[in-house]
């Protein structure tokens, strides 16, 4: 369960490896929207994205035995670098399965952070299935990119920083991919201010979350030991 205590704990832990990115006022968007609009530049993190927050906090919650087994995940870029960087900080081995279509620059950046990279499949789902297979075969601990409460808690620390700078914030717009960031940010934001409005944003051509909201859907899962 995501609680305020957990988010406060996560904020302290992720601050060991992340920058507290400061809000940037956007003249253009503020004028266009008729409101004061601020941007939170998480691209300024050392790994280039917010994903390191969830990866680092998740790894911090693992037992020494789980870390010793080695970590594994699947990603085409940002989560890969987040896990690789976090694993290096904890001094543990990380294996990242990336689709063969991943840009070489992302593959090299992940390798440069100390992770072993396995290229497999044309799309993320194929790489993820391979990662689960390797986790089962070698006993690795799987770090899911978004479907994990500890990961979502780490990502949600962004909201803690937003409220610190802008305590009277009324709306937060958060991008939706897998949903980990949106889960963490919306949960913490509502804990801090139940009246706040959190709006998820996704591409019109890839509106998976919106599509699911119109129907009942059972998602397949890949079991592993």
Regions found by a protein language model. Give the residues of each.
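PLP-dependent amino-acid enzyme catalytic core
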Residues: 1-217, 223
């Amino acid at each position: 369960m995501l609680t305020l205590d957990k988010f406060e704990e996560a904020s302290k832990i992720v601050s060991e490896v992340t920058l507290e990115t400061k809000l940037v006022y956007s003249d253009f968007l503020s004028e266009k929207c008729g409101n004061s609009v601020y941007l939170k530049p998480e691209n300024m993190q050392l790994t280039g994205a917010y994903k390191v927050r969830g990866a680092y906090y998740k790894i911090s919650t693992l037992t020494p035995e789980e870390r010793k087994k080695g970590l594994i995940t699947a990603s085409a870029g940002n989560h890969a670098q987040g896990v690789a960087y976090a694993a290096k900080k904890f001094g543990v081995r990380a294996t990242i399965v990336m689709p063969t279509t991943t840009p070489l620059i992302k593959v090299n950046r992940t390798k440069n952070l100390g992770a072993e990279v396995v290229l497999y499949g044309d799309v993320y789902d194929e790489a993820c299935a391979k990662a689960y297979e390797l986790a089962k075969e070698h006993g690795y601990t799987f770090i899911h990119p978004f479907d994990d409460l500890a990961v979502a808690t780490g990502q949600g620390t962004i909201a803690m920083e937003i409220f610190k700078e802008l305590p009277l914030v009324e709306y937060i717009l958060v991008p939706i991919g897998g949903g980990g960031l949106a889960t963490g940010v919306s949960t913490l934001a509502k804990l801090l201010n139940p009246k706040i409005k959190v709006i998820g944003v996704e591409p019109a051509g890839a509106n998976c979350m919106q599509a699911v909201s119109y129907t009942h859907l059972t998602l397949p899962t890949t079991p592993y030991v």
